[in-house]
UniProtKB/Swiss-Prot annotation:
Alphabetical UniProt keywords: ATP synthesis, Cell inner membrane, Cell membrane, CF(1), Hydrogen ion transport, Ion transport, Membrane, Transport
NCBIfam families per UniProt: ATPsyn_F1gamma, PRK05621.1-1
Membrane topology: Peripheral membrane protein
Family matches, as PANTHER family: ATP SYNTHASE GAMMA CHAIN, ATP SYNTHASE SUBUNIT GAMMA, MITOCHONDRIAL
GO MF annotation terms: ATP binding; proton-transporting ATP synthase activity, rotational mechanism
Taxonomic placement: Bacteria, Pseudomonadati, Pseudomonadota, Gammaproteobacteria, Alteromonadales
GO cellular component, one term: plasma membrane
Gene that encodes it: atpG
InterPro entries: ATP_synth_F1_ATPase_gsu, ATP_synth_F1_gsu, ATP_synth_F1_gsu_CS
Classification via Pfam families: ATP-synt
Annotated protein name in UniProt: ATP synthase gamma chain
Compartment(s) where it occurs, according to its Swiss-Prot or TrEMBL record: Cell inner membrane
Length: 286
């Protein structure tokens, strides 16, 4: 059994760590609230863009944009959004597991895979995982903007335009609620036709001045909006996961302190009992 002094030292060390995890929990809660506000403010735009694109994909167009056309799949690309920092439970691990399972299915069909990473954890993971990393961006911070994702998006669009990749997916952690964050894979290109009844009726659009020019700008803006919304959803998920992880760490530290305090009390009691026994034995010898 460790000495009372050693146990006291461990208790003190754990208490210091507990203060840190408690502070990190409060910081994460504050950041999560702000991230939720950004996420909520961006959702209407992203959803309306999705709605417009859904109608266009099912519409009778005088000009069919290449992003609307299916083609033989020889190579696919994933834009994977992760965190820059750790201490957020299994958030990144679960996401990477989902991606690797999906990649395995494509490779079994003889399809090659490329990646683009947003977040340092994704950058480091896919550098080790194998496959071609076409673009990488990290250090998005707590207040990401659309300009932060434009570079990665343009690289993937260029690869798609040139026929280097035939399908593009977006991977991120969808914020369901504080306790639940779900990794998802959404197809970006070609634009999937929605099965929603709202999009089933055909819409005829009149484009002014030029349908090609308008659709070119609209498609790029749509992709950028979806990737940006994935970034803010992932940011909210990160802070929620970190808050939960730090609360669990704080609670575990409290339980460990209680257990060590009990061990310390037993050790102290054993030491006192030993001293009394020695005194009694000495007195009896006299």
């Amino acid at each position: 059994m460790a000495s009372g002094k050693e146990i006291k030292g461990k208790i003190g060390s754990i208490k210091n760590t507990q203060k840190i995890t408690s502070a990190m929990e409060m910081v994460a809660a504050s950041k999560m609230k702000k991230a939720q506000e950004r996420m909520a403010s961006g959702r209407p735009y992203a959803q309306n863009m999705l709605k417009v694109i859904g109608h266009i994909a099912n519409g009778n167009l005088e000009y069919r944009h290449p992003y609307l056309e299916e083609r033989e799949v020889k190579r696919v690309g994933y834009i994977v959004i992760s965190t820059d920092r750790g201490l957020c439970g299994g958030l990144n691990t679960n996401e990477f597991k989902l991606v690797t399972q999906d990649v395995k299915k494509w490779r079994e069909q003889g399809v090659e895979v490329d990646f683009a990473a947003l977040g340092s954890k994704a950058c480091s993971f896919f550098n080790r995982f194998g496959g071609k990393l076409l673009a990488a961006e990290s250090g998005l911070g707590d207040k990401p903007s659309v300009s932060d994702v434009v570079g990665v998006v343009r690289v993937m669009l260029k690869a798609y335009d040139e026929g280097q990749i035939d399908r593009v997916f977006l991977v991120f952690n969808d914020f369901v609620n504080t306790m639940t964050q779900k990794p998802v894979i959404n197809q970006l290109l070609p634009l999937p036709k929605s099965e929603d009844e709202e999009y089933q009726h055909r819409w005829d659009y009149i484009y002014e001045p030029d349908p090609k020019e308008i659709l070119e700008a609209l498609m790029v803006r749509y992709i950028e909006s979806q990737v940006y919304q994935g970034v803010v959803e992932n940011a909210a998920s990160e802070q929620a996961a970190r808050m939960v992880a730090m609360k669990a760490a704080t609670d575990n530290a409290g339980n460990l302190i209680d257990e060590l305090q009990l061990v310390y009390n037993k050790a102290r009691q054993a030491a006192i009992t030993q001293e009394i026994s020695e005194i009694v034995s000495g007195a009896a010898a006299v």
